[in-house]
Amino acid sequence: MSWVPRFPEIKANLDLSNGEFGTYLSLGSVGAVIAMLSSGHFVHKLGAKKVLIVAALSMCLSIAVIAHLQSAPIFIIVNMINGASISAFNIALNAQAFHAQDRAGELILSRQHGYWTMGAVATAIFSGFMVEFVGIALHINVLSAAVFLIILFIIKKLEPEMIKASEEDDSDFGFKDLFTSFRIDYLVSAALICGIMVEFSTADWSTIYAKETIGVRGSLATIPYILTFTAMIVGRLGQHRITPYVSLEKQIKFGSVIGGVGFIGFICASSLLVDHSKTAAYICTLIGFSIGGFFSAVLSPTFFTAANKRSAQPSAVVVGQMGVINAILTLIVKTIIAWTAQFSGSIAIAMIIPGLMLISVAFMSRVAKDL
C-alpha cells in the first residue's frame, strides 16, 4: 500500500491520462486471476509458508521496480506480476485465518482484516509524510527491502501454527483440474464485488481526486485515503461488539445503504463546492470517503466467511476461486470507472458507480443470514 500516496507521481512518470492510468492499474487483475486459479491448490499441497515467502519476495521486488518505470508497457507487465504476488500472498494469509477461525470457533476474519487495514493506514501516513521529503525511488526501494525482512521474521515466528502441506496424494491433480474443480457461488460473488468497490475506488482515486479536483498539496491529498481506512479499522475491529445485538444480515442491509448514499452525496457535494470554498469541498471529500469506508468495512471478511461456510472445498481453494471471480469483475468495473472519469472529466461522477454498487448489497444481505 506504500505506493498509493505516490499514485500521482507514478501517473506523471508514465505520462498517462486518468483513463489510461486507471485501466493499466486495473490490469494487475490479470495477474491476480492467474495466481488465484492455482495459489489455493499450492497452499493446500505445499503449505502456507512456502507460498507466503515466494509471494512476498515477488511482491516487494515488483513494487520496487514500478517506482523507477517510465514505460507504460513495462508498467503493465510488472503490475500484473505485482497483482499475482499480492493475490497469492492474500490467499495463503486468508486460508491461515480460516484455519485459526475454525480452531477458535468464532468469527475472527473481520478482526484480521482490521489489523491489515491498520497496517495500510500506517503505511499511508508514513508514505504521505515521505512524499514531501524523499523521492519515490528511494522511498519505495528502502521500504520494500525492510518489509520483506519483516515478513520473513513474522513467518518464522508463526511457522508452528501455519497450515502444513497436505499428506494426501494429489499428484494426479493437473492443469485441467484447476477448471473442472472450479465452483462459482453467484450470490456471494455478486455481493462481494459490489461491497468492495468503494474500498478499491478509494485506494485508486482518493489521492488523485484530492490533488487534482480539490487542489490540495501532496501530503494533504493522502488524508482522504488515511481517514477512509481508519474508519474501516474501527468498523472491522468493532464488529464483534455489535453482532450480539444486531445480526450480520441487518448490519449489511442497513449499513450498505447508509454508506452508499453518504459516499455519493458527500463526494458529489465536494465537486460542486470546490469553486466556492476549497475548505468546504475538502471536508466533504473527507466525510464522503470515510462514510463509504466505515459502512463497507465488514463486507469483505463477512462474504469470504460466507463463501467458506457454503463450500465443501478446502478454505485456501475457496478463497482462490472467490478471488478469481472477484478479480475478473474488479478489472471490468475498475476499467468502467476509469473511463467514466476520463470521458466525463469528473472523478466525482465516476465515484457514483461504486456508491450505487454498495447500495445494491442491501438486496444480497441474506448471504450472511446463517453466520
Each language-model region and where it sits:
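Short amphipathic helix-loop junctions that connect adjacent transmembrane helices
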Residues: 4-19, 204-220, 342
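Conserved MFS/SLC helix-loop-helix module at the cytosolic interface between two early adjacent transmembrane helices
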Residues: 34-73
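Intracellular juxtamembrane helix-capping segments at the cytosolic ends
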Residues: 87-103, 297-311
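Symmetry-related core transmembrane helices of the 12-TM Major Facilitator Superfamily/SLC fold
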Residues: 138-156, 349-366
